[in-house]
Amino acid sequence: MAQHSHETGGGQGFPLLTDLVSKDSAPLFVENLLRGEKPRAEWMCGVEFELFGYDRARSFERIDAEQVQRVLAGFAPSSNDIVHEGGAVVEVNDGQMNRLTVEPGGQVEFSGAPQRRLADVERELRRYLARLREVAESNRLTFLAVGFDPLRTIEEQRWFPKMRYEVMRPYLAARGRRAWDMMCRTCAVQSNLDYGPPADLAKKFLVGNRLAPVVTAIFANSPFEGGRPSGYKSTRAAAWLDTDAARAGLAPPALRDDFAPEDYVAYALDVPMIFVQRGGRYLGAVAGVRFREFLERGRGGLRPVFGDWADHLTTIFTDARLKQHVELRSADGNDLETSLALQALWKGLLYDPAALDEALRLAPRLKGADALVLRERVARDGLAAAHEIGRAHV
């Protein structure tokens, strides 16, 4: 799941993050993807759960960077479990193999350790939320589980001081009118699931993307913006519609019935880069350069290394994406019970072979333009969204 360190290579006989790569490295990237294959008996499930924090003492302003860091530090068993960047607390390990991190607008994200059973996912989420209530109460804070900030405008947002976001902020702003809304004013619940052989990986990726509008509709939970109705069932989904189409929405390879892992690598190679890391710094010298071009010619004196590929994959924001697991990213932030229902839905569809085959058969097979129309209608109307080939409801 998201916690697996080997996703970025470095295993026995496999490149280190610092190893150079070239225009001939596409097979290596495919091999790295396929290293996520696991036997069915070892399949696990993971959850990523985001929340907005508000300051009760300041008329429910969004919490600032100092408050976010206090919240994170409240989960650390010791100072050794705290990750700093430039003096700021940016990540905490809670002693149970779970991580807490921060999104660009100070949203707090719980990344759960992979679990065999949904009951164990529930146990860890309940433990996290119980502790969060204690930390919030001691700091006079309130946390809200919705898909879009219902109260504060983009001008009122507080940006968290993280180097990655400082590079992403201007890049994405130039490529989508609502990119900053996406970064600061959205929260999601994400499901992370394992896969078996390449054919199983392909089915899960296709279903995850093709059913994304249906899942968005079922779990739509963001009808407000600026303290009033926004006109959307999922304002979060609406924000994503105007955020860098080169890396968001329905993954183009999912339009292919003959999809194979090589197609995902080929797609990712043509997605423009945002940054690379060198010496603990995020460098935007590669911004806008397709990864394929970076492999061929480098950029600004920089030569591509294997770790650049791993970083690049984290900047692809499609409804379902691949690392060494499948990430399912189409649902609004929701409360505990609804978030657990989401996990059960995805696990039931993707881990039962008969259900997976039937889901693939029933999932909409849309052309690119039709898929965009469906996403727009789902954002506005949720389960009532109509499309000429059917309705986005179950």
Where are the regions a protein language model picked out?
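Structured core elements
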Residues: E50-F52, Q190-N192, E327-R329
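Long, well-ordered mid-to-C-terminal structural blocks that present hydrophobic/aromatic surfaces
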Residues: L283-D370
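Solvent-exposed residues in well-ordered beta-strands and their adjoining turns
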Residues: Y54-R56, A113, D194-G196, A331, ...
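Conserved small/polar residues in nucleotide/adenosyl-binding loops
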Residues: A392-V394
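Conserved aromatic-histidine-acidic binding/catalytic patches
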Residues: P39, R116-D120, E124, N192-G196, ...
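Short, compositionally biased segments
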Residues: E388-G390
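Terminal catalytic/cofactor-binding subdomain
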Residues: A2-R177, R185, A220, T338, ...
